Amino acid sequence: MPQSGPRRDPIRARPETGLTGALTGPYPARVLVPDLPLRTARLVLRAFTTDDLAVVRDYRGRPEVTRFLYHQPYDDAAARAAIDRLVRRTALRAPGDVLNLAVTLADTGEFVGDVLLTWTSAEHRQGEIGYVAHPDHTGHGYVTEAARELLRLGFDGLDLHRIVGRLDARNVASARVLERLGMRREAHLRENEFVKGEWTDEAVYALLAREWRAAA
């Protein structure tokens, strides 16, 4: 979420929804507490720890990374506040919860970014995926590989019906990641948000559980 920045730019994560509460109604009362760390062919997806403060300060402090995100580049205080949130985001127990995992290389342990899955609705079984790539490790498909694992968790672990991805419409590189995940572009919303002093367009992508399983 500029072509002059990372080759695989971050998708724009939404602000906190503030949704909480017990599940009631005619839908599954499921929770997702993954057995961390998760492993893919090349990556390890693990919980954040306070030891990640320096790397979070580094990559989230770069203007090219945050250009299409809601927040400004992190300073020391913002990085500390972020770590306080990130270390707690290890499970989805209620709507509004966020699962946010650090992504590292399995062979070397190098940090390559983070991915997140937000449980947006239990009643409608919906979620939202997001990611932020470390600009020193773009162009290798790491974000796509990690995000695919979170789609699997959302559909197979939490039994979601639909997962969306939202991004600044100027972020062509991030749109390509979503397309590689099999997500379809459903909307282009004109000047629907005022972010960092300007009206911005938003693109919306989505994938249904049956589409995910058919492509598996």
Task: Locate the predicted segments by residue.
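GNAT-family acyltransferases
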Residues: 2-136, 153, 157, 191, ...
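Conserved phosphate-binding and hydrolysis motifs of nucleotide-dependent enzymes
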Residues: 49, 113, 171, 180-182
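Conserved acetyl-CoA-binding loop-helix of GNAT-fold acetyltransferases
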Residues: 131-133, 139-156, 172-180
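Conserved GNAT acetyl-CoA-binding A-motif
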Residues: 157-166
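Short histidine
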Residues: 167, 174, 186, 198-201
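Conserved acetyl-CoA-binding loop of GNAT-fold acetyltransferases
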Residues: 179-189
